[in-house]
Amino acid sequence: NDLFGNVAPAIPTSGVDVVTGVGAGKGYLMKQGMTVVFSGWQGDRPSSLSGPTAAITSAKKWYAPGMTLPVAKENGARITGASQDEFIADNASSNLLGTYYPRAANTAASLTIRKTPTDAPITVDASMWTYTAGTGVAEGGNTGATGFGFVTIDRAKVRASSAYAAALDAGSDNGSIYHFNYTASDPKPMGLGFLAVRDLISFLKYEKVDLQGNANPVAGNITTTLATGISQSGRYLRDFLWLGFNTDKQLRTVFDGMLPLVGGSRKTYTNYRWSKPGDYSRQQETHYTPGDQFPFAFSTITDPLTGKTDGLMKK
């Protein structure tokens, strides 16, 4: 009922090593002549298999590796731009909102609150929140000192003030939407995550050596390539297909088949400036996040609302 059987894989000491020893578990898929490749694509996730990010255990025999991306520059200069991060509490005490990107120094910022996504936001007085910069070692959205930064909200003062009554539910801000609006800096070209998977699979499928002369470990042995992803990675595969990345630079087919699971009708918030690949639109949370727009189906159809004609397999 899993990829490896009932034996826990052994974790290498370095993220660049091969999972060895009992890493293949009982090797069921390999005994059927298959090669299993886990490919990182999310540029805001750790790419190391070691330390606290290691996720291969007896109970969880897979690992979703990230990828290391450069910080984008414009003619060598730092890029800044408007960004927004969200906080919704389900209890009375949580009060930390982690920013997904570093806040540019000496720039204005504001915090707003609203009851539902379609309500007009109410600006929270600056005396009711503080921003603390982080070291940027951890992932975006982290609310600790090693994140990019975080906002501490004095929710008790917000609840006590009549100025925000319209954004509350009978005096409670549980479920209310806080937005931190700020000037972000140092975006990463997250869309390269599509190229990374495309080029990796194309290399394994077609090439003998890479541009540095490194040998393809499975050269000549790959006849059919299949991709599968669950939930977020399922949405990624739908986006990958729609954006046209299933054809490599030589116009060769990358994946012969795909099995995106639990992705629903969605794509991802990846190939955008100030993107957040792990985020997605929900009824209340991050409601306006890109990735839940037409097209939804694999076949090419016309959307009656926008008049657009498109499909995930059109390209």
Segments predicted by a language model, with ranges:
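C-terminal His-loop and adjacent cap/lid subdomain of alpha/beta-hydrolase
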Residues: 1-315
